[in-house]
Every structure is written in C-alpha cells, then in structure tokens.
A protein has these predicted regions:
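Acidic, polar-rich N-terminal leader regions of halophilic archaeal proteins
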Residues: 1-176
Length: 176
C-alpha cells in the first residue's frame, strides 16, 4: 500500500504573509525542501488552500500535527519544521484532552537527513516515557504534553519549537 507523506508549504509574500499549499509527497524524508530550494522548479503547482495568511494562521488553522508530517516555509531560504504528534490517550482520563491533542513543530536542518532522524528519535523516546506515565495515571494528557514540550525546548538548544493550538484532527483549531 502506498501512502502519501502530507505536508504544508507556506510561500512567503512581499507583504509578509503566506500562500498556503498542500503537498501529498515529500513530508517523510523532507525531499520536497530540495525542490523548493531550486528556483527553476515549481513542485507545488496546484491552487493554494489560502492566500495572504499570517504565519500564526498557517500554524493554527491549516496545520494538523496528526495529518501533516512537515511544514515547509519558503522565504529567502526554505525552512523546514518536523511535525511531532503527541498521540496520548488510553490512560485514566481516556477522553481526548484538547490541550494535548496536537503536537509540536521543531525546526530541522533539511540538508542533513541525520538531523531529522535525530529529532524524531529523541521525540519518540520522550513521548514513550510520558505516555507510559499517562497510562499508569501518573500524568494527565495535558501534563504529559507539557513535560514533553518543556524537555524538547531544553534539549533543542537553538532550534525553533512551536506549539500549534490543539486541533480536532481536521486541520482546524478546536475552539482556541
């Protein structure tokens, strides 16, 4: 079975806003970044999802950490953010807590495939520990997400870390 590796692409505009596009491929290995960096190519040829969007809206209204594997931002140089989904659930409070439903965006060096793999592996380990504590009833979903976020920010050094508003799994924010 072939599965697409979804991503969002935000093209910077002269007015400081972004045109937002959907990409069905390129999110898994960040290969799309190489195409986006080449001015001779136009890897995103479809109509945009939206035009003239503030960056906060790209992250808060269009990006869903469960659906999208990456966010590519094309300004002077492409910036790539790996999407890291919390995925907590099934613990004592098994209902989905909207404050922990989403995930994080972490800046990665798209020119170094080991960098992306390193970030993903670190997050998988931190999430596994927090999820185990949540399942045992030691942490709520909200606290598990907060612990992982704080640890990632400490570990990330100079990487940009963004916590998008929680989403309902539809790519739209849930009441915040």
């Amino acid at each position: 079975m072939i599965v697409g590796h979804r991503a969002l692409v935000a093209y910077g505009r002269e007015d400081g806003r972004y045109d937002v596009y959907y990409s069905h491929w390129g999110g898994a290995d960040l290969a799309l970044a190489r195409q986006l960096a080449d001015p001779a190519t136009d890897p995103v040829a479809d109509e945009p999802l939206s035009r003239a969007v503030e960056f906060a809206a790209v992250v808060g209204q269009y990006l869903d950490p469960l659906v999208h594997e990456a966010l590519f931002v094309v300004d002077d140089e492409p910036r790539v953010y790996r999407t890291l989904w919390f995925g907590f659930g099934g613990g004592v409070d098994s209902s989905v807590d909207e404050s922990s439903a989403g995930g994080l965006l972490v800046g990665v060096d798209w020119t170094d495939p080991c960098d992306d793999a390193h970030v993903r592996a670190w997050f998988a380990g931190a999430r596994a520990v927090a999820a185990a504590c949540h399942k045992r009833g030691e942490l709520s979903q909200t606290m598990a997400a907060t612990v992982v976020e704080r640890a990632l920010r400490d570990w990330a050094d100079d990487r940009e870390v963004i916590r998008p508003p929680a989403t309902s799994g539809t790519g739209r924010t849930t009441g915040r």
